[in-house]
A protein has these predicted regions:
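Non-catalytic DNA-recognition/assembly elements of restriction-modification systems
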Residues: 1-17, 131-147, 158-203, 324, ...
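Sequence-specific dsDNA recognition surfaces
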Residues: 5-20, 30-59, 191-209, 223-252, ...
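Short coil/turn segments at secondary-structure boundaries
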Residues: 20-27, 118, 186-189, 206-214
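A short beta-sheet element
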Residues: 33, 52-106, 221, 238-299, ...
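Active-site/binding-pocket entry motifs
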Residues: 37-40, 69, 88, 111, ...
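Short, solvent-exposed loop/turn positions at domain surfaces
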Residues: 50-51, 157, 244, 311, ...
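A short glycine-rich beta-alpha junction/loop motif
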Residues: 66, 80-87, 118-140, 259-260, ...
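Short amphipathic alpha-helical signal-transduction/dimerization elements
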Residues: 105-109, 113, 153, 299-302, ...
Length: 372
């Protein structure tokens, strides 16, 4: 049987410094918090003063967030300072392949999550963290495993970059044909969204009748509006659920638009007749607009429209606000030309996405094989 070692016997884990809000300024070294690692921060603070040398991080340092959001990262953004709730890993106890260690910890994040404590700020206590065990083969085997997994990760990243290039290509084509819609650089006629089709919002069937959620009709939440075409919802409902609630059946080819909080102006086009909850608005377009063109028109104007949201804690839109939004309208034949271009690009994207999904399955299988 493969030898196992405790994380606490492999390395020393140095917690970051508890910087105070008043320590954060605009000059000096960046203060790295958990949200700066996860990509959810748009507000990097800086510290220009003396600090414990142990909380300094540099390229190549391995970091582990252990509170609120668990994760393992290899730092690559230059000299910085580590905030509390993140460990810097010092490999000072035994010889270990650092990349192998990162993959092993990544695999064990779910086990760590199960050991988290706390009502508000969930965290894993140091004792539980130290006691987590990982397989510990020879140095040669560690390197072999790390190299194999890195190759698969690189393929995954390359596939993701391919998908991003397709998105960039579509946006470039849009601007080439229609200009910048926020500034209406092509001087197109302006129309309100209310004039471009029939509008409605969704609803939620009663949860006290579980049978309502045992049907085969897609019922979307705003959080599921992540792709151009919607392929299927997490929850399904029955025809009776639609008849006895505020939800409605929207036609295939309609566009769902999220209205609330972080899902505001997330969008997706229905491939099948479907329903949604009350957090979604829906437009069934008239003959003046091609729905694929409208999707991209709204994507291009998304940030402009989001700036008009209401609410202090939750920045929300509502159906009336969305219907009142005004957009430049291109000629229908140009819309159709753009839509045909998108469909061709989408065929290529589907192939790359399939390859990405298969590579991700391979990675997950290898992780299970090596660390499960």
């Amino acid at each position: 049987m493969m030898e196992q070692k405790r994380l606490g016997d492999i390395a020393t884990y140095i917690n970051g410094y508890a910087f105070k809000p008043e320590d954060r300024g605009t000059e000096g070294l960046p203060i790295i918090r958990i949200q700066d690692l996860t990509g959810n921060s748009y507000d990097v603070g800086f510290y220009n003063g003396e600090y414990p040398k142990k909380v300094e991080i540099n390229n190549g340092d391995v970091l582990i967030s252990w509170s609120a959001s668990l994760g393992v990262y290899i730092w690559n953004r230059g000299k910085a300072l580590l905030n509390q709730h993140i460990f810097k890993v010092a490999f000072d106890k035994i010889e270990v392949n650092e990349q192998y260690f990162v993959f092993a910890v990544e695999y064990n994040l779910k086990e760590m999550e199960a050991k988290m404590h706390g009502a508000t700020m969930k965290h894993i206590i140091k004792r539980d963290f130290d006691n987590i065990k990982i397989p510990f083969p020879s140095a040669e085997k560690q390197k072999e495993i790390a190299d194999i997994l890195l190759k698969v990760v690189n393929i995954i990243e390359n596939r993701k970059q391919e998908l991003k290039k397709f998105d960039t290509l579509v946006k470039a084509r849009f601007v080439e044909l229609f200009g910048n819609p926020v500034y209406n650089t092509n001087d197109l006629p302006i129309r309100s969204l209310n004039e471009l089709g029939n509008w409605a919002s969704g609803g939620t069937p009663s949860r006290t009748v579980p049978e309502y959620f045992e049907g085969n009709i897609d019922w979307y939440s705003a959080g599921e509006l992540n792709t151009l075409f919607l392929e299927g919802s997490v929850e399904k409902i029955t025809e009776e659920a639609i008849e006895k609630s505020a939800t409605k059946l929207f036609k295939a080819g309609s566009l769902l638009i999220g209205m609330y909080d972080t899902a505001a102006l997330k969008m997706g086009i229905l491939k099948e007749d479907s329903a949604s909850n009350q957090a979604c608005a829906c437009i069934t377009p008239n003959d003046e607009v091609n729905i694929i063109w409208l999707y991209y028109e709204l994507q291009m104007m998304k940030e402009y429209f989001l700036s008009q949201r209401r609410g202090v804690r939750q920045k929300n839109l509502n159906l009336g606000m969305i219907k009142a939004f005004k957009i430049p309208i291109a000629k229908r034949d140009q819309q159709d030309e753009f839509s045909d271009f998108v469909k061709q690009v989408d065929k290529s994207k589907v192939k790359v996405q399939k390859a990405l999904d298969e590579t991700q399955k391979l990675f997950d299988s290898l992780m299970q094989q090596y660390f499960g």
